[in-house]
Amino acid sequence: MAICIPVNLPDRSYNILIEKGSLANLGGEMSQLSLGKKVLLVSNPEIFDYYGQIAVNSLEKAGFAVFTHLIPAGENYKTLDAIAQVYDSALAHRLERSSTMVALGGGVIGDMTGFAAATWLRGVNFVQVPTTLLAMVDASIGGKTGVNHPQGKNLIGAFYQPKLVLIDPDVLKTLPVREFRAGMAEVIKYGVIWDAELFQQLEDSDNLASFSQIDGELLQTIITKSCQAKADVVSKDEKEAGLRAILNYGHTIAHGIESLTGYTSVNHGEAVALGMVAAGAIAVKLGMWTAGENQRQTDLIEKAALETRMPPLNADEMVNALTADKKVKDGQVRFILPTAIGQVTISDRVTPTLVREVLSPTESGQ
């Protein structure tokens, strides 16, 4: 039975549908949304090989005319040049304002497809079909779209909500173990910032490190709870005027790590895990939460088989990278810091000196 989570917004409300096997009914779900008949399905070659034909068959069965555009996998393809190629496909297939771009893939595909949809003809319809755990619980929900700039991650983008987010947990069976663990970092994040009960469930679970070992019912629960947390926050603050900033917990340091490692050696979820470790250590130093709570967070991250020790990075370069973060206000880097399991706050008390201390090898992971 499908779980339906509404994202309630003033102008563009939509539903998150979670159901095993639901990819085969993508066309049926979209046919209820009064969309035009043309669909541009955007994916990467590997995901398309696994699931593209299921999506295409479902869409065509529902009467849609389907065209495809494939983008090579990887954060280094998240560029304006790649977006221009999506535009070329949209032009070649004569997409209209009533047409729909469907993102079938992970966070990179979702971000790029959403940005292309937001900007082509000043906005065409957009549907998210996430195929990674990270995209299911985070990137596909909330309307953040965009691409990277050489100087920073997601600096070019727009808020543009999808018409539908369709989540089929069955597609996770082909997700590489490393990517599954990356998604668990975002799940843990929701436990720290919003849902102490979810955090406790994760602590009590037997295995979090792979799809093949995690309990199927638990997986459905953590996807649902994570989506509900994201939907609750986005419904209250669509464009990050205040509350929504808490979703960036761990991301300030994470984006710096990704930038300094060239978006190659450390993936987004791994960087978020390291960012949460750093934020937790900063919060302890500022007296905002206890060493015991911080250790619980570190232990849970390690339970998901995620690294908690910083890679060798130049602390000064990291501090400089933080100044390009989107959360900078009046030149001051704002950190999301934990105050208890299930609660965080926005702080401007974090100095460059404190960041350097936490990033030093003797401090990281503590």
From Swiss-Prot:
Q: Provide a Gene Ontology MF annotation, just one.
A: metal ion binding
Its UniProt pathway annotation is: Metabolic intermediate biosynthesis; chorismate biosynthesis; chorismate from D-erythrose 4-phosphate and phosphoenolpyruvate: step 2/7
Class of the enzyme per the UniProt entry, highest EC level: lyase
Copy out the cofactor comment. Answer: Binds 1 divalent metal cation per subunit. Can use either Co(2+) or Zn(2+).
* EC number(s) per entry: 4.2.3.4
List positions binding Zn(2+): E186, H251, H268
Annotated GO CC locations: cytoplasm
What Pfam family is a match, any one?
Answer: DHQ_synthase
Q: Where in the cell is it found?
A: Cytoplasm
Q: Where does NAD(+) bind?
A: G107, V108, I109, G110, D111, T131, T132, K144, K153
Database matches in InterPro entries: Dehydroquinate_synthase, DHQ_synth_AroB, DHQ_synth_fam, DHQS/DOIS_N, DHQS_C
Could you tell me which NCBIfam families the record lists for this protein?
aroB
Chain's role: Catalyzes the conversion of 3-deoxy-D-arabino-heptulosonate 7-phosphate (DAHP) to dehydroquinate (DHQ).
**What name does this protein carry?**
3-dehydroquinate synthase
Q: Which organism is it from?
A: Microcystis aeruginosa (strain NIES-843 / IAM M-2473)
Q: Gene symbol?
A: aroB
